[in-house]
């Protein structure tokens, strides 16, 4: 999700007053920090000149932690206390973690986000990520020679509210002021679009260590519009490592394996994968803790066979994103590759074959996201320079709505809406004297609440008692620049108000997102039939409720025969409401409504006479 930049906060009036802000690519495998210096964005290296920081944290028995290369070296020897690829766990519950059986960790199935047992105690993914972010913050401050005013941190476009909030929490824990969360493909678009002065429709194919994103972007005269997004936040280079590791286990007959040996084989698998990016074959040699030895030859051809379905798994969201954008493959003017995993020849061949053109690779795929984030951070800090006259528009991937009577969904913000965005809609009460309203916030493309994802519930109380339909409750949905949702409800007469910030306890898996979209497309006709049925039932129940109150108050206005006729129509409607034919229900509602027109007119006459009783004509003037 999410960035709409219209105007910038106070700009620095002079170069010597420039405020220091950085862009951080918090990656699954590696993380980077970059800054704009002398109008040039650059990745900030460590003391040894290394731009990448392995996203690895090892907790020590005596307290403290090793971060980066030092931790990576110890990963095989101390796998349970060395956390790698923590990004996969951000905002996730235990059931959402992919390949959990192949991880060496002791998980704690805590409410909400998964936690990990270490020698230093139970750690959350937020705490682990904060260690990485704090290291990058210190690197930046040491390099730039001053404190930072803030950072733009990149996240996968398909990160949901829980994952985004977890990222912001980690940044705050690391002492960073978050200027903005920025989609990784969007960050790449900033870097490529500005560097190359490109215009037209582009695709950004971003395959990192643990996440995959695809974005379709329209670049026109400095305006970056994200037309659609897609992806899988549990698919990345790590999955290719897993395939190789499983192949090694199968070829060498190595079951069962200790956590230490599994980590060793994953490291060997990663090394083999990287070697095959520039060679036709590689040797895999390992000595396990049991003394067993492994010697295998992995060819590029075998690797392609092992990972073919993973490659295809990235192409399905690409096709879906193109459909959502209303763009044909031949309209794409260029494909930008982002993420170290895109160095794999199997990926580059598949992308070239799908789009019918070689992808763009003139920027380092490991660094392009951090560079784009640094450029955005510099602008948000107020460091505008000549030529920084560009606009960025981004979108949300799934519709946001509210449940109405009958279990229906009223969409407030449709999917692919540009954000930040605020939309409001008025609703009313269903019953006479209703003083409270339950607000059920939903996400998804289906017509009925039961088929959508529940995000939050809250109540608006203190509504003044009125007849049904008289109260006006204004419900406002607001998605901020980081893609986080807040919902408020306000009764317009009394001013009573309630609100909630939506923070799901754990994230929505991307298989679920894809399934929700697919079901929405496939079930559209049936959903509309069910919606029509629910709407007619609600209308029927509303009419019966109103008529019941009217008969209690003014039933004496009807003769015995008239009352019998109305009762017969009421009974007929009640029977019809139990059926599944929405047209029959509508006919029964219309019949009862027309059958009580005369009764309604008599009630109105009685009400007018009561209101005028005892008043003089001049008082009415």
Curated annotation (Swiss-Prot):
PROSITE patterns given in the database record: HSP70_1, HSP70_2, HSP70_3
Pfam families: HSP70
GO BP, sorted A to Z: iron-sulfur cluster assembly
InterPro entries with a match to the protein in the record: ATPase_NBD, Heat_shock_70_CS, HSP70_C_sf, HSP70_peptide-bd_sf, Hsp_70_fam, ISC_FeS_clus_asmbl_HscA
Keywords: ATP-binding, Chaperone, Nucleotide-binding
SUPFAM superfamilies, per database record: Actin-like ATPase domain, Heat shock protein 70kD (HSP70), C-terminal subdomain, Heat shock protein 70kD (HSP70), peptide-binding domain
Origin superkingdom: Bacteria
GO molecular function terms listed in the Swiss-Prot or TrEMBL record: ATP binding; ATP hydrolysis activity; ATP-dependent protein folding chaperone; unfolded protein binding
General function of this protein: Chaperone involved in the maturation of iron-sulfur cluster-containing proteins. Has a low intrinsic ATPase activity which is markedly stimulated by HscB.
NCBIfam families for the chain: HscA (TIGR01991), PRK05183.1 (NF003520)
PANTHER family to which the protein is assigned, alphabetical: HEAT SHOCK PROTEIN 70KDA (PTHR19375)
Protein name as annotated: Chaperone protein HscA homolog
Record organism: Ralstonia nicotianae (strain ATCC BAA-1114 / GMI1000)
Species lineage: Bacteria, Pseudomonadati, Pseudomonadota, Betaproteobacteria, Burkholderiales
């Amino acid at each position: 999700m999410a960035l709409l930049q219209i105007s910038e906060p106070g700009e620095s009036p002079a170069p010597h007053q420039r405020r220091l802000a950085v862009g951080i690519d918090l990656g699954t495998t590696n993380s980077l920090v970059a800054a704009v210096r002398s109008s040039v964005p650059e990745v900030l290296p460590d003391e040894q000149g290394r731009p990448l920081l392995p996203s690895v944290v090892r907790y020590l028995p005596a307290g403290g932690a090793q971060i980066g290369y030092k931790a990576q070296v110890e990963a095989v020897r101390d796998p349970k206390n060395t956390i790698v690829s923590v990004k996969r766990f951000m905002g996730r519950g235990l059931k959402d973690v992919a390949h959990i059986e192949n991880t060496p960790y002791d998980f704690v199935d805590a409410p909400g986000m998964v936690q990990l047992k270490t020698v230093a105690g139970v750690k959350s993914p937020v705490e682990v990520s904060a260690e990485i972010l704090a290291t990058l913050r210190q690197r930046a401050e040491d390099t730039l020679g001053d404190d930072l005013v803030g950072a733009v941190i990149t996240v996968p476009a398909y990160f949901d509210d829980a994952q985004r909030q977890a990222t912001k929490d980690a940044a705050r824990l690391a002492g960073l002021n978050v200027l903005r969360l920025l989609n990784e493909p969007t960050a790449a678009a900033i870097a490529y679009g500005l560097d190359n002065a490109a215009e037209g429709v582009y695709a950004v194919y971003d395959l990192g260590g643990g996440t995959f994103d695809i974005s379709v972007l329209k670049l026109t005269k400095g305006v970056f519009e994200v037309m659609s997004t897609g992806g899988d936040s549990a698919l990345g280079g790590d999955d290719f490592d897993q395939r190789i590791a499983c192949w090694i286990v199968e070829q060498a007959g190595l079951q069962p394996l200790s956590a230490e040996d599994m980590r060793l084989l994953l490291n060997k698998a990663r090394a083999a994968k990287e070697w095959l990016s520039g060679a036709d074959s590689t040797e895999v040699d390992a000595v396990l803790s049991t003394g067993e030895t492994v010697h295998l030859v992995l060819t590029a051809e075998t690797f392609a066979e092992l990972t073919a379905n993973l490659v295809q798994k990235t192409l399905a969201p690409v096709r879906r994103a193109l459909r959502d954008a209303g763009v044909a493959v031949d309209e794409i003017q260029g494909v930008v590759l982002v993420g170290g995993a895109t160095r794999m020849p199997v990926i580059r061949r598949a992308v070239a074959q799908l789009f019918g053109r070689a992808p763009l690779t003139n920027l380092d795929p490991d660094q392009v996201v951090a560079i784009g984030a640094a450029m955005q951070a510099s602008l948000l800090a107020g460091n505008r320079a000549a030529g920084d006259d560009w606009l960025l528009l981004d979108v949300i991937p799934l519709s946001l709505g509210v449940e109405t009577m009958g279990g229906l969904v009223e969409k407030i913000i449709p999917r692919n809406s540009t954000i930040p965005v605020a939309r409001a809609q008025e609703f009313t009460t269903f019953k006479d004297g209703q003083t409270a309203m339950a607000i059920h916030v939903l996400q998804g493309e289906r017509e009925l609440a039961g088929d959508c994802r529940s995000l939050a519930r809250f109540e608006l109380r203190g509504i003044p008692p009125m007849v049904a339909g008289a109260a006006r409750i204004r419900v406002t949905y607001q998605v901020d620049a980081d893609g986080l949702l807040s919902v408020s409800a306000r009764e317009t007469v009394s001013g009573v108000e309630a609100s909630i910030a939506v923070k799901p306890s754990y994230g929505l898996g991307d298989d679920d997102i894809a399934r929700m979209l697919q079901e929405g497309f496939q079930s559209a006709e049936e959903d509309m039939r069910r919606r029509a049925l629910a709407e007619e039932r609600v209308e029927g129940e509303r009419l019966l409720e109103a008529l019941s109150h009217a008969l209690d108050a003014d039933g004496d206005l009807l003769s015995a025969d008239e009352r019998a006729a109305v009762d017969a129509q009421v009974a007929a409607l009640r029977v019809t409401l139990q059926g599944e034919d929405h047209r029959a229900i509508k006919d029964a509602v219309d019949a009862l409504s027309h059958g009580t027109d005369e009764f309604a007119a008599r009630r109105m006459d009685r009400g007018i006479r009561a209101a005028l009783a005892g008043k003089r004509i001049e008082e009415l003037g």
